[in-house]
Amino acid sequence: GTKIIRSAHEMNGPIDDIPGRLAKMRITGFEIPKIACMPRNLTDVTRMFQQAATLEPGQQILCAMGPLGLPSRILADKINSYLTFVSPPSAEKLKSIGHIDPLTMNKIYDFRAIDKNTDIYGIIGYPLEATESPTIHNGGYRNHGMNACYIPIRCETVDEAMNFAKITGIKGLSVTVPHKESILPHLVEKSPE
């Protein structure tokens, strides 16, 4: 039968109990509940990933909005989301709320190939607006036939990035400004080079 998308948008922060809110949105059984929220920090995005891990795949749509929420759009499969939302390349103003265009999603991040077995890597920094690292790394992964994806992870602190990496199973991180020195206590091995 036909299903409808029943949406809940929270523009002022995260939704604390995502599974509970989804359950309340399932009224007739013909809904695909959608939750979109505006995270205040990467910790809010991490909580979404944690809660999403308890959900049945493909039975809901989840999205953290804004630049902080970009990982939830790219890694929709990893948060058991039925789909993700993109915008036309001409919609520049939508980038401020974390929208990404479908060409970038597929050409840079190889979105359609991301699955539960995809190894995730990333770059952490703030504000992380002009990095070419995903283009370079994801191109290399494709050239070597690797099931891997490299994503930008906008974070104000190294601690929240390390927690996000732990919760999401990220295999490795590159570090850029302003975290190049604050990452040092988290390193297992250091050298003068």
Question: Where in this protein do the model-derived segments appear?
Answer:
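Phosphate/diphosphate ligand-binding glycine-rich loop within oxidoreductases
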Residues: 118-193
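Catalytic alpha/beta core domains of metabolic enzymes, predominantly
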Residues: 2-117
